[in-house]
């Protein structure tokens, strides 16, 4: 899954004067027992399309999933359970709209208001999704302090409840920084937290280290590793994202 910082880093660049379209493809692997004693593994391969026009950014993410011993899905979301040892197929599609309230011209502060809708395109009978719509509202903020850029996210997610479950609607937050470490290369770290989704569950707590390298004007690549510190987070995770701007 793409970490929270991925969307923030995309907004650090200078706003384009005209409309722009970009795509990305990623590959993410995560592993953990999530407090069950049985190890679950997730391969997550998202294809992303993003269109920017003025202060607005529109994005759609369509992923492919492969889950071993399904317990949780991408982003630590709970799954129905009761499926085979290995399931794979289309994941849930996520769309988002982002309004840049501040573009950096006011004191160097970037402030984005973001709304997301998760469409239940994954097969819940294969434990690849819940079969319900989810909704997210969040605020992203970033500011440069010399060569270091600090960033943060604060948001709230509304889960669609399954007939035999009652999910809580959690608040989540992220805090991190990024800085140049070489020519066309940026590195940083972020800490992500989210309230528990079920009463018997745990909060998400995880640390991400990342590096982004600009290959050319049109291409860049991002590598990251994640360490979880709770039963709701993976024991270990890593991945890469390749971006292309048209």
Model-derived features: positions:
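Transmembrane beta-barrel domains of Gram-negative outer membranes and organellar outer membranes
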Residues: 16-162, 170-246
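Active-site cleft segment of glycoside hydrolase catalytic domains centered on the general acid/base Glu
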Residues: 165
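Cleavable N-terminal export/targeting peptides
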Residues: 1-20
């Amino acid at each position: 899954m793409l970490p929270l910082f991925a969307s923030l880093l995309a907004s650090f660049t200078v706003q384009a004067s005209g409309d722009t379209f970009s795509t990305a493809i990623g590959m993410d692997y995560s592993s953990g027992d999530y407090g069950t004693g049985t190890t679950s593994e997730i391969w997550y391969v998202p294809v992303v399309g993003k269109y920017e026009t003025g202060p607005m950014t529109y994005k759609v993410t369509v992923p492919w999933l492969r889950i071993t011993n399904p317990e949780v899905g991408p982003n630590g979301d709970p799954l129905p359970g009761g499926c085979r040892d290995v399931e794979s197929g289309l994941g849930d599609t996520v769309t988002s709209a982002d309004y840049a309230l501040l573009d950096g011209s006011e004191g160097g502060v970037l402030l984005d208001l973001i709304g997301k809708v998760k469409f239940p395109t994954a097969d819940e009978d294969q434990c690849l999704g819940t079969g319900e719509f989810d909704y997210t509202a969040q605020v992203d903020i970033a500011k440069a302090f010399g060569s270091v850029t600090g960033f943060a996210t604060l948001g709230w997610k509304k889960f669609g409840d399954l007939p035999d479950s009652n999910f809580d609607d959690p608040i989540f937050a992220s805090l991190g920084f990024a800085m140049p470490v070489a020519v066309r290369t940026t590195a940083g770290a972020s800490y992500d937290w989210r309230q528990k989704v079920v009463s018997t569950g745990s909060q998400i707590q995880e640390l991400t280290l990342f590096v982004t390298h600009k290959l050319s004007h049109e291409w860049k690549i991002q590598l990251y590793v994640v360490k979880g510190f709770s039963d709701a987070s993976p024991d270990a995770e890593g991945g890469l994202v390749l971006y292309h701007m048209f």
